[in-house]
């Protein structure tokens, strides 16, 4: 596990030096639309008085918007370089940044009302991370995550072909998820009311002139049996 964490710290340094937003594809017009959709998926469940743990906050792309909910946000990452950028991007009084390993959290059990994150679980040793998430949640606490879908053809190639992985700026150990095994793992960990839905057919490199039409078509495909399984991402919700 320590070797994996060391690689992620090194990867965080790479992202900080080379522009995380570009590597993560949040900066393009289509990328910004995809980002906004994920923000809503995570933040719409939060509100004042809630204690929320954000895993893998990175440069604070999502932290800033989560803070607008009024919840008390503890935003964590293993990378000090990314956390420094996050602090500059969002210095809201209801946000606290900490260096933490998501697979070995220092928090007491039953501390958080919700644990959230975007594109973070696939960087972790998933079994250990889910046990820690479950432990730090309050009874009836909830999780909300968006993660890459291994059934998507581009994602499958990107996560499994080493030279492609390097070209896209992935970290060495990151992967993606098949939703049914992930669902079973969540249930084995103790979570209930597990829902995992594929979503997002909009590619971040989509030309501006085509974004509206392709986004609408993608939303249509998300409701099509079988075809929806090949969407680019998974929306994960569950209750302790």
Where do the PLM segments sit?
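A conserved beta-strand element that flanks and buttresses the S-adenosyl-L-methionine
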Residues: 116
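Class I SAM-dependent methyltransferase SAM/SAH-binding core
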Residues: 59-104
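Acceptor-substrate binding/catalytic loop of class I
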Residues: 124, 166-181
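A short glycine-rich, Lys/Arg-flanked "PGG" loop and its adjoining helix->strand segment in the class I
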Residues: 128-142
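Conserved class I S-adenosyl-L-methionine
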Residues: 1-46, 49-58, 144-166
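A C-terminal cap/extension of S-adenosyl-L-methionine-dependent methyltransferases
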Residues: 97, 142, 158, 162-163, ...
